[in-house]
Curated annotation (Swiss-Prot):
Keyword annotations of the record: Cytoplasm, Guanine-nucleotide releasing factor, Phosphoprotein
PROSITE patterns reported for this sequence: DH_2
InterPro entries linked to this entry: ARHGEF10/ARHGEF17, DBL_dom_sf, DH_dom, PH-like_dom_sf, WD40/YVTN_repeat-like_dom_sf, WD40_repeat_dom_sf
Organism (species): Homo sapiens (Human)
Protein name: Rho guanine nucleotide exchange factor 10-like protein
Positions where Phosphotyrosine occurs in the chain: 131, 152
Purpose: Acts as a guanine nucleotide exchange factor (GEF) for RHOA, RHOB and RHOC.
Superkingdom of this protein's organism: Eukaryota
Amino acid sequence: MASSNPPPQPAIGDQLVPGVPGPSSEAEDDPGEAFEFDDSDDEEDTSAALGVPSLAPERDTDPPLIHLDSIPVTDPDPAAAPPGTGVPAWVSNGDAADAAFSGARHSSWKRKSSRRIDRFTFPALEEDVIYDDVPCESPDAHQPGAERNLLYEDAHRAGAPRQAEDLGWSSSEFESYSEDSGEEAKPEVEVEPAKHRVSFQPKLSPDLTRLKERYARTKRDILALRVGGRDMQELKHKYDCKMTQLMKAAKSGTKDGLEKTRMAVMRKVSFLHRKDVLGDSEEEDMGLLEVSVSDIKPPAPELGPMPEGLSPQQVVRRHILGSIVQSEGSYVESLKRILQDYRNPLMEMEPKALSARKCQVVFFRVKEILHCHSMFQIALSSRVAEWDSTEKIGDLFVASFSKSMVLDVYSDYVNNFTSAMSIIKKACLTKPAFLEFLKRRQVCSPDRVTLYGLMVKPIQRFPQFILLLQDMLKNTPRGHPDRLSLQLALTELETLAEKLNEQKRLADQVAEIQQLTKSVSDRSSLNKLLTSGQRQLLLCETLTETVYGDRGQLIKSKERRVFLLNDMLVCANINFKPANHRGQLEISSLVPLGPKYVVKWNTALPQVQVVEVGQDGGTYDKDNVLIQHSGAKKASASGQAQNKVYLGPPRLFQELQDLQKDLAVVEQITLLISTLHGTYQNLNMTVAQDWCLALQRLMRVKEEEIHSANKCRLRLLLPGKPDKSGRPISFMVVFITPNPLSKISWVNRLHLAKIGLREENQPGWLCPDEDKKSKAPFWCPILACCIPAFSSRALSLQLGALVHSPVNCPLLGFSAVSTSLPQGYLWVGGGQEGAGGQVEIFSLNRPSPRTVKSFPLAAPVLCMEYIPELEEEAESRDESPTVADPSATVHPTICLGLQDGSILLYSSVDTGTQCLVSCRSPGLQPVLCLRHSPFHLLAGLQDGTLAAYPRTSGGVLWDLESPPVCLTVGPGPVRTLLSLEDAVWASCGPRVTVLEATTLQPQQSFEAHQDEAVSVTHMVKAGSGVWMAFSSGTSIRLFHTETLEHLQEINIATRTTFLLPGQKHLCVTSLLICQGLLWVGTDQGVIVLLPVPRLEGIPKITGKGMVSLNGHCGPVAFLAVATSILAPDILRSDQEEAEGPRAEEDKPDGQAHEPMPDSHVGRELTRKKGILLQYRLRSTAHLPGPLLSMREPAPADGAALEHSEEDGSIYEMADDPDIWVRSRPCARDAHRKEICSVAIISGGQGYRNFGSALGSSGRQAPCGETDSTLLIWQVPLML
């Protein structure tokens, strides 16, 4: 691969030695390139350690230093270079990466000596010159001039003889050096070396001894020249410095680096850099090649004049395209500003305000991101030029951002962002020149955006693209040639954003565990647990620990870092020194000498209990436990002094009880006053009633205070050491969370982490990778319980269907909402052939489901459908709460389809199980499936008929008494129905018929499977696609909802091979899509989980998925979802409630609160949910020094610009017009987020743990192998 750089020239400012002739023609035939090192203020002088005072070039008559005797042989790759180009037959990607992405300045020089001239010629040196006399091994005199500066040269030409002296240059010359000598300080980001470094050996190798001898000989030659003057002294000093760097590189280099050094000298490749520069090893492994972008700017993308006669959607699409062009142009300019205004000046600055090594860390991968978007901008320019004729943009996004290189460079940048901000923050305090440089650049910038504001833009680029493509897709009509490509582009960007989120989470998890491990002694048991590799960080946050006195007064509070691991809870102090008397942090605290954290306590997770205010009695045994509050001096017996010790909110609870007692006394006084015969001042019924009303108002205020205090107060009961008598002592620790959302997250994760420690969840899921050791991610569903489906086991009833009826229970406490299953009731239907059917109703308003009602039916239940309340009726009811005719109100209902053709409607509000209305299907055909749409209740029958019951007004939603509208779909049974926005899909055999939603007129049909004997059994929709399962075969297929095109096919058997070895015949029996996960149930009882996109793009599967180790002994009869929405008022903190409408008025334009979503569950389930890239920047907020911000702070007294408060959310960039404002910081946005509690229920015969098949001990099944069983998985709250 030829170098794109021009031939190296002497740098400006360097001068040749007076009286020394220039390079001759023969010297130019030997273009030996120098090896480069970046200048750094962290370099140390190691020449004394080596005993080498100075070094100068040698004469050409001396024997060569390097002998090529052990060159590694590499198999040639004919694809690496086309024939006839003169490029070597094989190329090292790692070398190319080093050459292309090195952060140091590139410079080189040529030897200016000649064998015909018998005098010494001193070369023109630049600062970065290291190797000054590297001979070119076997130069090709006939090589054309275009190939002289090749980055790589053939070490062994094909068919060329190998001489004896060319067969060896062993790396043993450098094995006598250690990394410890002269090594500079460790970088901010710890990068593990690729290989172990060699040990220190003081004995020099023969080649280095020969090097020292030649060094002394050459020095004598220099002195003999008698060329004095200032220029000669400067050149000698530069030469000595560069040779010092060379010797230091030889001493501190790893074996891997020395091998590359040897190859570099042999090939004359200028890629050698210090091993500790961040990014070298990563770039070698990635194999990224630098894209040469011409300095000549291509024409900027610009839309031409708008043609006449455009439709409104075309006009909007042009405006959105203009926003894409403007946003991309601004983004590319921001990336260029980072390099031109900050990185390049910092690298060239003398003296350096920031070392080259730190510059590499701060600006890591910015150049590569710029290359990606420069190419995208060029393609965008050509697409904009032909917009009026094509109107296509989606395929450009797919082609540009589906490459793995884009994911790699953005992953490196995002994972390095926190470290870069840490370096900048520390440098602002330790180096005034650097802070002055940042201020000066900000003042000179046209928009006065800080470096932080520029560097945060790559993090939020893909959320901006997603928003723009969503708007473009909304304004692209069906049938447009750009619609499918836009949906595919939206899927690519969403998948890319999800991968970046997951990689960022894993990187933060590893970094936090490493920091925690450093704070623990090497001999402690906690250190062994943390370093075992079995610990997974579930949640980590900075909370405020509070300590109260005997009367409930706040004694002290301090910030703690709390770590929730998969099996333990750790609390640590943040190890930063306090401020001085001026209120400023000491400079010595910026670089901590010790660990970042100091562990205060840690405890096993099963022993941690969450205690809510007013619910202490049911949490622990007060008679056998002593309560010692954290920070208290003495432990007080809970049964004796607990009534006198009030802990914050419990004090409010006690005051509420006192008010209730006072109100009872005042009511008695009121009764006594009413018996008075005389009239007395201030002692009459009016005053007594005022007393009662005042006490009632105080009670309401106290209840609100308790409720508000409980929202952000996390009370944990921790085990302590027993006292002298052996009685256990428990410690109460109180943490204040930043917002109610944070507390919900802690309570939920603590609860699920405890469940995850059960035997059936160790492990609960397996990723079928090659090593079979991949850990399931933290968001993985956890098996919460396994219960019998029917209370009566006398008859072996078969499962038919299950639905969830959501009902909000106001009696549940704050933590109960976070830990319990989705509120509501489970309706489970089934039966037995010839023995009738049965319906079982379970209540989910408790930690474990319990049966509340069971009733028999005349025939087995084959299908069920939950029909929520209509949206418009719910809105009218919310506007006018008083209804004249309560019987006219339509409540949510449960519709049942039986084997004898009966269709029954039950009210889901109460559990009285009174049948509202019933009817019989045409011909008494068994009802195989039920679906509701805004216009009809649809029933698929056994004979291929589709029965549609229209909507009515009144207390019953559907007119089941009148004859239904019947439509023949096909000769076979209608097995499944799917209701879309404007269409209904009905399957019959291998074909699917698409019906118009209102008139049910057939629009078109297509063949989903080529085998006529196969039937479509399940259809689920996600985004713009429909996944289908079939009656036989191991595959599921994806079809487009608009073009009906077959997009993807997935073989489920490949995911279950290691669980069921030798099982060839596998069939999919159930499908479910929920929260970006596709659940697949099989006839062998195995459940497979596949990730799918959540947005309105194409829901294609890109990941490998997971397989559950918990399943059924028989086929998975159904998969159902239970979902409930947490009430929005639960998420409002007391401060937000106190602000009220005043806070809305105080917000600037564009930052007002969004309208509060309606809390009705039925409508929330149908509402589309979007995701965005959610990189959290909170990990830099705890660092000392000025906080970073992209905003221009308000100048105080004409002072220079300072850094203001750091933004808490990456989307809050309202000062920049090119940034799309999507949401606000976490603390203020908490009460507007929808918190969904989700559980997945599978039904089948018995319970089976597949862990025994992998060699682990199988768990004893709670039910028989033939009993109908429900498995309930609880999904972590999506916060």
